[in-house]
Amino acid sequence: MEDDRMISLNDDTAHGGRGFAERVARKALQQITPKRRGPMPYLAIGITIVIGLVALGVPVDAQSWQPPADDQRCPSKWGADDERGSANHMKPETVLRATQLIKSGEVIELAHVLSPSIPLVGTRRFDVHTKRTFMNQASNRRGSNEEILISEMGQVGTQFDGFPHQTIADKVYNCFKVDEIASRGGFTKLGIEKVGALITRGVLIDVAGLKGVDILPDTYEITVQDLEEALRRQNLQLQPGDAVIIHTGWGKLWGKDNARYGKSCPGIGVQAAEWLAKQDPMLVGSDNWPVEVLPNPDPQVSAPVHQILLVVNGIYLLENLKLEELAAKRVHEFAFIMQPLKMQGFSGSTVAPIAVR
């Protein structure tokens, strides 16, 4: 009887994700001789691969996400010329639905204070220079002071991501080509000035609370099951047009450990993002800097949640939220109010949203 050879899963260069799975599969197939190439050996090999991946801690459904083709995502459900995406949910009835949640009139601020000491990712900066003037010569001795700010007003602090911010290849939301809408002075379509004021039902999904921790572990991927269990625990269901806010606890590091804050973070993964998109929210926000888990479990994929929500589905992102007070008071449902700055052609905006209950 022919000896069955073991398939080795020990590969010094192996790491999590699709690349590792492919290497294991190739190695397995190489060990199947012509006499053994039938359905049963392939089934055994497949089971061996799955068991090996699980044993090594590699997710079988690793996030090997690839963007859909243009004709699968465009035109937008809001129309081929649409520039507002999920902001189209903003209607009088949306505002009225939100105001019905206000019982005490308490206002909870959801934005961090902007200062030169805030966490900054990549090449972003926030430099403030005080501009002092002398007293003028009028009899009332009026003086004047101002500030000069050198910064990216769209991508610092608590920030709102608009549609030009991310692309799939050379196209943004609704398949507008970057080369055709980008100008020296901003984007001629999809600019943040098109969004307008957003007043809607806000829902805090407290995943850190669900897990019984102050801060979720670094690089923890929030799953669909996490979101569903947290909502059940809070006795809430999502509705179209909601502002969905996810509490990870990562915001506790803001201004205290900026290096750790900006290095990685817990957040939603691909499956959770696709599930949220099906709930048809107005926006998805979190108390971390990219909303999604970083680094991505698949090292070959870069920030796919941004593409899934912004580019494919036309759903806005809200980053670097201050959620500790909201979570501590267990305010899970509230009126959400936010207005992006009216900056023509910008891809995002620094914002100061509030929750009112």
Where are these regions (language model features)?
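Active-/binding-site microenvironments in catalytic and ligand-binding cores
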Residues: S8, A25, I32-T33, V60-R357
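Bacterial N-terminal signal peptides
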Residues: A44-A55
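N-terminal export/targeting leaders of redox proteins
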Residues: D12, V58-P59
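Hydrophobic alpha-helical segments and their boundary regions
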Residues: P41, G46, I148-S151
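N-terminal secretory signal peptides that target proteins for export/translocation
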Residues: M1-Y42
